[in-house]
Each structure stands twice: as structure tokens, then as C-alpha cells.
Design a protein with these regions (language model features):
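Membrane-interface helix-capping segments at transmembrane helix termini in multi-pass transporters
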Residues: 11, 121-124, 129-145, 161-192, ...
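Small-residue-rich hydrophobic transmembrane alpha-helices
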Residues: 48-156, 202-218, 320-378, 382-384, ...
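Alpha-helical transmembrane segments of multi-pass membrane proteins
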Residues: 164, 177-205, 283, 327-331, ...
Length: 493
């Protein structure tokens, strides 16, 4: 099958159609942020540092809610949309003959991880069949409505939390009360937090569109918002002389524009008002969302601890580590595009019990992930030694970066596989395993980080991070290789 990894058959076209726009959308925001940074840098170094701290704080708080919300929404919407499209006329006819038929069919359409979870999914999908009569009408997708409500609530909670606690939170981030960074940092964080509801709402809608296997609409909306942000930045900052406040206002406007575009497009396809409150899927979202929240905390703690350990080794090591880490993480955005496509296609295939497509899709995205990782390793191996000078001209920092480059380059195939395995497991709605396995991986990795960094300093940190990513990839491989959980069907293949 490896010879056909790049073949543009039906699965290959589906993967490309979803993965490429998803990867472009994921890279659009970092590019816009770089433009933001360039404009803010024109004001002064204090303002640049202040905004950097505020953005780091905002992103850290947002990440806790964003990842579980988007991942859960993508899988659930894909499942419900697929089931809603499965011969609606036949389902309606059969339901007139006997009400028990719907229950038995819906049970068969759900991958059974365990009896309790299967019963829960079967019960929720009965209500979906009741409201999913699609006759040239907008679709009824309960998980889409649920995601938007949860996203809006989380956005308002985040805004209130960041605005009311801006000063103490910035103090916690290292900006003291007498620091010249405090006032601009507080101004920027307070204003940017007004856009939190739009950020969470737009990402919830991106999850819905991903569930529909549509990543082009989020791409167009994101590009429109980012272009607006780039245009408004110099106008508000320099013409209106609002400084860092102008940058924050421009960003907030762009986020609300993205939300409006996505909401407009979504309302054309989906009836967002459910027939009644009981059709919403809050319980399912909260259960699986909390599992992924636990996973996000484990991942964040490992990366944050590694940065903290590098900082303890001095400014030179920390500067070199930040350059290596940013390159290491940025390349993962391309693998995330594959993960998104794998998740959406697999969730749909599992809902239809099309195990042949499940096997073919999982195999293809993993092969593409490995190929992507090898390509990134070659590109970074050839270019990073020279490209490092774009980040710094300090000789000592460049020397330490050269020590980290072999790890950054060598782990690219492992990283790509780890991220794609995440998408594969999410597509199988295997959220519990993903969460618990990541906690175990984090515990082992934290021990390695503490021991190796104390013994081998900078190299030790990167050896530990290599172990961390290897364990993440191994956990994904183990689940499929042992044919357990949603992959039990492989035993009969």
C-alpha cells in the first residue's frame, strides 16, 4: 500500500480536500500574528514585550477550552451528519412500521467502545433520527447547536476571567506592579479579551464545518479576518494613535468578522434552533470535553516544564530553546491538517460501520504523516543551520541552537505520526484512551525531563522531549496494534 500513498483515489482526494485548507487555515493566524508583532515593534521594545506576555497569557487560557471543544465537535457532528444522510426515506418508512427499528439500527451504526458508552450514544442518536428529516431542508444537527452554546458560554467566562483578573494574572506571568510593561500589557489584554466570545464561537463553528468535511469555509473566513486585522492595525495604531490598544481593537474586530462569516454560512446549512432543549448534547460534550481537558493539561505541563528547565540554565540556553521549540511546534501545523482530515473521514466511516474505509483511511493518513515527517526532516536539516541566523546573531545562542538542531530535525517523523495518531483516535471517538494514555505519557516524560535536564542540561531536555513524542506516537500505535477499543473489528479482518 505504501506505493499508493500519494495516489489520488477517492480516499486520497478526500484527505487532500480536507487537509490542505485545514493546514492553510492553521498557518494563517501565525502569519497574521507575525504582522501584528512587526507593527507593535514600531512603537517600542517595552510595548512589544508587554504585548508578547499578554498574547501568551490569552493563548494559554484559550487553549484549555479550544482543543477539547473543536475536537469533540468535529467527531460528533461528523457522526450525526453521516447518520442523518443514511437513506432518510427508508428510515422514515421503517419507523412507521415499528418504533423499535430505529433503536436497533442506531445501535448498529455506532462503534461500541464499551456497553455503557454504546447505550449512551444509541439513546442520543434516537433523538437525532427524530429531528433529522432531511427533505431539501436545513439539517438538524444537535451537536452543532450544542457546540455553539458551549462555545459562547466559555467565551464569555474567559472574557470575564481575563478582564477582571488582568493585573494579578500579569503579575503571575512575571510583569511586576512597578514594571513599565504593566500598563500596556493590561490595556492590550483587557481589550483583546473582549474578543474571547468570538474566538471560542468561531472555533466551535470550525469544528462543525470540519465535521461536514468542509475546511474551505473556515479557511476563507480566517483569511478574511486576518487580512482585516492587518489592514486595521496601522490605521488604529498610527493614524488614530491608539498604540497597543489599537492593535487589540483591530484583532477583536477581525475575530468578530470571522464569527459572523462562519455563522452566516452555517445558518444556510443547519437549523441551529433545536426542537427542544432535550435534543442538545450537553452531557456528551461535557463528558468527553473534560477527558480532553485533562489531556490538554498533561500536554501543556510537559512543554511548559521543559521551557522552565531551559530558563533555569540561563538566558543563552533559554533563547536557544525558544528558537528550537518554535520551529519544532510550528512544523506540527502541517501534520495537524492531516489529523483533521483523518478525524473527519474516520468519524463518518465509523458511524456507517464502513470498516474497510476506516482501515484504508487510517493507513493512508499515517503513511502520509510519516512521509510528511521525513520531508520536513530533510528540509529542516538542510535549512535550519543557516536559518537560525534569522532569529538571532548572538554567537553563543547560535552555538546552543546547533546542539538542538539534530533533535528538532530527527524527531519530525515521530512528531508527525504522533499528531496524526491523535486525529485517528479522535475520529474513532476514543477520547478516554487518548486522555488516560496522555496522562501516563506525561508522568513518564516529566520524570525524564527532571532527571535528564539535571544530568545533561540542554541536551537532556531535548532527549526527554524526544522520549515524550516517541511515547505519544507509541500510545497511538499500541491502541490499533492491540486491536482494542474501537479497533476490535480488526480481529476479524
Amino acid at each position: 500500500m505504501s506505493r499508493h500513498v500519494l495516489k489520488l483515489d477517492e480516499i486520497g482526494r478526500d484527505i487532500a480536500r480536507i487537509a490542505l485548507p485545514a493546514a492553510l487555515a492553521l498557518t494563517a493566524d501565525p502569519i497574521a500574528s507575525m504582522m501584528d508583532t512587526a507593527f507593535i515593534g514600531q512603537i517600542g521594545p517595552v510595548e512589544l514585550a508587554a504585548v508578547g506576555v499578554s498574547i501568551a497569557l490569552f493563548n494559554q487560557v484559550s487553549r484549555i477550552a479550544i482543543f477539547p471543544l473543536v475536537s469533540v465537535t468535529t467527531s460528533f457532528v461528523a457522526e450525526e451528519d453521516t447518520i442523518g444522510k443514511l437513506s432518510p426515506e427508508a428510515q422514515e418508512s421503517e419507523s412507521l412500521e415499528t418504533g423499535s427499528h430505529v433503536n436497533s439500527e442506531s445501535k448498529e451504526l455506532i462503534p461500541q467502545n464499551d456497553p455503557v458508552e454504546g447505550a449512551s450514544k444509541s439513546k442520543s442518536l434516537i433523538s437525532i433520527f427524530e429531528v433529522s428529516k432531511i427533505e431539501n431542508e436545513r439539517r438538524h444537527i444537535p451537536s452543532a447547536s450544542s457546540a455553539l452554546v458551549i462555545g459562547a458560554i466559555l467565551g464569555f467566562v474567559q472574557a470575564i476571567f481575563l478582564i477582571s483578573g488582568a493585573k494579578p494574572l500579569l503579575n503571575f506571568m512575571g510583569v511586576s506592579s512597578d514594571s513599565p510593561m504593566l500598563i500596556p500589557a493590561q490595556q492590550y489584554l483587557t481589550l483583546r479579551s473582549l474578543g474571547a466570545p468570538a474566538v471560542l464561537l468561531s472555533l466551535a463553528m470550525q469544528g462543525v464545518f470540519r465535521g461536514f468535511k468542509d475546511t474551505k469555509t473556515p479557511l476563507y473566513a480566517t483569511v478574511a479576518g486576518d487580512i482585516t486585522n492587518i489592514i486595521l492595525d496601522p490605521i488604529f495604531m498610527f493614524i488614530f494613535r491608539l498604540g497597543v490598544s489599537g492593535a487589540a481593537i483591530a484583532h477583536v474586530i477581525s475575530q468578530y468578522l470571522i464569527s459572523i462569516i462562519l455563522l452566516w454560512r452555517l445558518m444556510e446549512q443547519v437549523d441551529l434552533l433545536p426542537p427542544s432543549f432535550r435534543h442538545l448534547q450537553f452531557g456528551k460534550f461535557l463528558k468527553n470535553g473534560l477527558l480532553l481537558l485533562m489531556r490538554v493539561i498533561a500536554v501543556t505541563f510537559c512543554v511548559t516544564l521543559s521551557a522552565s528547565l531551559a530558563a533555569r540554565q540561563g538566558a543563552t540556553s533559554m533563547a536557544a530553546f525558544q528558537v528550537c521549540l518554535q520551529v519544532w511546534l510550528t512544523t506540527s501545523l502541517l501534520a495537524d491538517g492531516l489529523a483533521v482530515s483523518g478525524q473527519a473521514i474516520l468519524a463518518s466511516a465509523f458511524a456507517k460501520k464502513d470498516y474497510e474505509k476506516v482501515t484504508a483511511t487510517a493507513s493512508r493518513v499515517l503513511q502520509l504523516g510519516l512521509l510528511l515527517g521525513l520531508m520536513l526532516a530533510v528540509i529542516l536539516g538542510l535549512g535550519l543551520s543557516f536559518g537560525a541566523r534569522l532569529f538571532t546573531s548572538d554567537v553563543d545562542v547560535l552555538h546552543v541552537i546547533s546542539i538542538g538542531i539534530p533533535f528538532v530535525v530527527g524527531t519530525q517523523p515521530i512528531n508527525a505520526l504522533a499528531f496524526v495518531f491523535d486525529g485517528v483516535n479522535f475520529g474513532a471517538s476514543d477520547f478516554a484512551y487518548s486522555a488516560y494514555s496522555m496522562v501516563l505519557v506525561a508522568i513518564i516524560s516529566i520524570i525524564c525531563l527532571l532527571f535528564l535536564s539535571s544530568s545533561y542540561k540542554f541536551i537532556g531536555i531535548w532527549v526527554a522531549l524526544t522520549i515524550y513524542m516517541s511515547l505519544r506516537a507509541s500510545a497511538g500505535f499500541w491502541r490499533i496494534g492491540t486491536r482494542t477499543g474501537p479497533w476490535k473489528f480488526l480481529r476479524s479482518c
